[in-house]
Amino acid sequence: MLDNVLRIATRQSPLALWQAHYVKDKLMASHPGLVVELVPMVTRGDVILDTPLAKVGGKGLFVKELEVALLENRADIAVHSMKDVPVEFPQGLGLVTICEREDPRDAFVSNTYDSLDALPAGSIVGTSSLRRQCQLAERRPDLIIRSLRGNVGTRLSKLDNGEYDAIILAVAGLKRLGLESRIRAALPPEISLPAVGQGAVGIECRLDDARTRELLAALNHHETALRVTAERAMNTRLEGGCQVPIGSYAELIDGEIWLRALVGAPDGSQIIRGERRGAPQDAEQMGISLAEELLNNGAREILAEVYNGDAPA
């Protein structure tokens, strides 16, 4: 790598490219003279579009190819949507920077109805997420929930073509793509608890690359990192990938972390919820202890079914 060049591995979807350009612009603003190049690539999750993500299986569907590029020194950093980042990293790689979080809520998107509660019984709602599915089914068991894959533009096209009465997307993604006007309602965490890390952008690099880590330090957002640390610690203990019915959301209020989490049966028949409040320095331990509580209260059995019998210990 040339001293003044930094290469970013990124997926090629519009949202992934937005994230990569966001990081590129931040780096160039912080380090005048730095040349930042994008290295676009295709991941397994981008290719398999005809199967619900939960059935594709495997963790890291959207990041593995980017990590291989780092290990082979074809790129210096990989930029990820934090909700897609597995809890474990290949040896020698790690998450070193978490950028400031955008709105983490889920968005209700419809051309006909103003809110989730306004949908008539039997309406078809699209989502690819078991987490969204279980919360939707609990609140509105009279809806028909169908799988919805593809990038944001593809999903909106399917809604506009009449395949769905409404779809659920991330507020952050719509805002970043300039599509905020499509949001009919942002769903509060009480109705749809977000995914772990939702709305945050993370940066992965080789852990022994001191120069790159130094360049990235200016982009780290301390409050976001604390919140996402608590969320990810809980997910790690639950052995959760990005395609499981797990929600987790941490807020920093009056100097204290408030962490909420849930594990749900995909059909909404049972959702185990819990919460913790504590000091920011205890973020990781809070996540672990909340996960233990959920497991002991029934989450172990729910996850065993989702993981085909392979439950967290």
Swiss-Prot record:
Annotated InterPro entries: HemC (IPR000860), Porphobilin_deaminase_cofac_BS (IPR022419), Porphobilin_deaminase_N (IPR022417), Porphobilinogen_deaminase_C (IPR022418), Porphobilinogen_deaminase_C_sf (IPR036803)
Protein's pathway: Porphyrin-containing compound metabolism; protoporphyrin-IX biosynthesis; coproporphyrinogen-III from 5-aminolevulinate: step 2/4
GO biological process: protoporphyrinogen IX biosynthetic process
Entries under PROSITE patterns matching the protein: PORPHOBILINOGEN_DEAM
UniProt catalytic activity: 4 porphobilinogen + H2O = hydroxymethylbilane + 4 NH4(+)
One GO CC term on file: cytoplasm
Database matches in Gene3D superfamilies: Periplasmic binding protein-like II, Porphobilinogen deaminase, C-terminal domain
Subunit and partners: Monomer.
PTM-bearing positions, type S-(dipyrrolylmethanemethyl)cysteine: C242
Cofactor: record remark: Binds 1 dipyrromethane group covalently.
UniProt enzyme class: transferase
GO molecular function terms attached to this record: hydroxymethylbilane synthase activity
Alphabetized Pfam families for the sequence: Porphobil_deam, Porphobil_deamC
SUPFAM superfamilies, per the entry: Periplasmic binding protein-like II, Porphobilinogen deaminase (hydroxymethylbilane synthase), C-terminal domain
Additional remarks: The porphobilinogen subunits are added to the dipyrromethane group.
Keywords carried by this UniProt record: Porphyrin biosynthesis, Transferase
Family statement: Belongs to the HMBS family.
Protein name: Porphobilinogen deaminase
The EC number(s) this enzyme carries: 2.5.1.61
Listed cofactors: dipyrromethane
Gene name of the record: hemC
